[in-house]
C-alpha cells in the first residue's frame, strides 16, 4: 500500500513546485531526504533507567530501533565523561519517513496545547527545517499512564531544497501548519 503523503507529493506537489519555481527537470524539484529524531537525555548520567525509557518511547514514536548517542568529550560541570550514553536518535527514510511526517502533521501537532502553528524561522539556510517538541505525549503511541517523565525531542526534516523558500513551500504543501 503506497503512502498517502508520498502519492500526494508525486501527483500534486512536485508538479506545482516545478511550475512555481520554473525547474527544467523533475529531479530539480525539492523532496524530503530524511527525518532525524533526537532525544537528549541529560539525566542519564545519574540514572541509566531514564535512557532505557527514552529509547523505548523513541522506538514507539518512530517505528524503528533508536541508536544510542554517546558524549564526545568530558564536561566536569555536567558530571559527564567521554563515551557516556546521553541520548538516542533515529533516522527515518522512505516509507517510514512519510508515515511519520503524516502522523506528525495530522495527529501529533494538533494535540499540542495552545498550538498556533510551527515557527517560520526554524530553517537553517540550506532548506532544512528543525522543530522542537516539548512533550512526547502528543504522539498517539505513547500511553499517558506509563510515562513517568515528560521528555522533549528534536525533529529535523532534511530536504533537497537549495533555499529556505523552496523548502518552506514544500513543507507547507505537505501540510505543515506554519504560524501566520
From Swiss-Prot:
GO terms for biological process: translation. PROSITE patterns: RIBOSOMAL_L5. GO terms for molecular function: rRNA binding; structural constituent of ribosome; tRNA binding. Keywords: Ribonucleoprotein, Ribosomal protein, RNA-binding, rRNA-binding, tRNA-binding. One of its GO terms (cellular component) is ribosome. The keyword Cytoplasm does not apply. InterPro entries: Ribosomal_uL5, Ribosomal_uL5_bac-type, Ribosomal_uL5_C, Ribosomal_uL5_CS, Ribosomal_uL5_dom_sf, Ribosomal_uL5_N. The keyword Transport does not apply. This is one of the proteins that bind and probably mediate the attachment of the 5S RNA into the large ribosomal subunit, where it forms part of the central protuberance. In the 70S ribosome it contacts protein S13 of the 30S subunit (bridge B1b), connecting the 2 subunits; this bridge is implicated in subunit movement. Contacts the P site tRNA; the 5S rRNA and some of its associated proteins might help stabilize positioning of ribosome-bound tRNAs. Belongs to the universal ribosomal protein uL5 family. PANTHER family: 60S RIBOSOMAL PROTEIN L11-RELATED. Part of the 50S ribosomal subunit; part of the 5S rRNA/L5/L18/L25 subcomplex. Contacts the 5S rRNA and the P site tRNA. Forms a bridge to the 30S subunit in the 70S ribosome. This is Large ribosomal subunit protein uL5. It comes from Limosilactobacillus reuteri (strain DSM 20016) (Lactobacillus reuteri).
Amino acid at each position: 500500500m503506497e503512502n498517502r503523503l508520498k502519492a500526494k507529493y508525486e501527483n500534486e506537489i512536485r508538479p506545482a513546485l516545478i511550475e512555481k519555481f520554473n525547474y527544467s527537470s523533475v529531479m530539480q524539484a525539492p523532496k524530503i531526504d530524511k527525518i532525524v529524531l533526537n532525544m537528549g537525555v541529560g539525566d542519564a548520567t545519574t540514572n541509566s533507567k531514564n535512557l532505557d525509557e527514552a529509547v523505548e518511547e523513541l522506538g514507539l514514536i518512530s517505528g524503528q530501533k533508536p541508536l544510542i548517542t554517546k558524549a564526545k568529550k568530558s564536561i566536569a560541570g555536567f558530571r559527564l565523561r567521554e563515551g557516556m550514553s546521553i541520548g538516542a536518535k533515529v533516522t527515518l527514510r522512505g516509507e517510514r519517513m512519510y508515515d511519520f511526517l503524516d502522523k506528525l502533521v495530522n495527529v501529533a501537532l494538533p494535540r499540542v496545547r495552545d498550538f498556533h502553528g510551527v515557527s517560520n524561522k526554524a530553517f537553517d539556510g540550506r532548506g532544512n527545517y528543525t522543530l522542537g517538541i516539548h512533550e512526547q505525549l502528543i504522539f498517539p503511541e505513547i500511553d499517558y499512564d506509563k510515562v513517568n517523565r515528560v521528555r522533549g525531542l528534536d525533529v529535523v526534516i532534511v530536504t533537497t531544497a537549495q533555499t529556505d523558500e523552496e523548502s518552506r513551500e514544500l513543507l507547507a504543501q505537505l501540510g505543515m501548519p506554519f504560524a501566520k
